[in-house]
């Protein structure tokens, strides 16, 4: 997407176009991933090919999060040169999925009877997730905790509750 795109836009695409793709690149996906460091996909299965990944910068990062079938499967992305790959699926490393955040976000909000779930609370959840991986553990196949890591829910809930208090939406 890009600002000013005339077709297939909606309000969220319009907002995203304002904060992403600042160079307003247009064309096919193959055109715009050439030379890119990162691909973030949340759209449709099979959209990204190994040939496209090969045109990206060396050691590219590919987040292929369409679910249940990603834009490209991890083995193909890695074979094409991607250094870090994630999907929305639990059967591959680096699952990026809302299942990591939602239970803890709601637990934290309920614990303080938050009147709203606001941006500071969402950011607190993201920071809590990232803090669970130590620098020693961080590697290409472990950039985010696993969904069933028992630390995830409590860490996210505590961070969200604290952010609710700090942002004034906690009622207890």
Predicted regions span which residues?
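Short acidic, glycine/serine/threonine-rich loops at helix termini
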Residues: 3-11, 51-53, 73-78, 97
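Glycine-rich phosphate/diphosphate-binding loop of Rossmann-like nucleotide-binding domains
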Residues: 1-44, 171
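Long hydrophobic segments that form regular secondary structure
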Residues: 25-79
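Adenosine-phosphate binding glycine-rich loop
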Residues: 64-172
């Amino acid at each position: 997407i890009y600002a000013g795109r005339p077709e297939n836009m909606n309000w969220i695409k319009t907002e995203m176009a304002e904060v992403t793709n600042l160079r307003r690149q247009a064309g096919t996906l193959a055109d715009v991933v050439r030379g890119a460091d990162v691909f973030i996909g949340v759209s449709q299965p099979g959209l990204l090919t190994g040939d496209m990944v090969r045109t990206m910068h060396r050691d590219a990062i590919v987040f292929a999060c369409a679910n249940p079938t990603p834009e490209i499967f991890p083995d193909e992305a890695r074979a094409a040169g991607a250094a870090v790959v994630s999907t929305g699926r639990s059967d591959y490393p680096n699952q990026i999925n809302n299942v990591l955040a939602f239970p803890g976000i709601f637990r934290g909000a309920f614990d303080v009877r938050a009147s709203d779930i606001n941006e500071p609370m969402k950011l607190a959840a993201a920071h809590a997730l990232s803090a669970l991986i130590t620098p020693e553990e961080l590697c290409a196949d472990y950039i985010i905790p696993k969904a069933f890591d028992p630390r995830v829910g409590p860490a996210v809930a505590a961070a969200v509750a604290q952010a609710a208090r700090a942002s004034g939406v906690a009622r207890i």
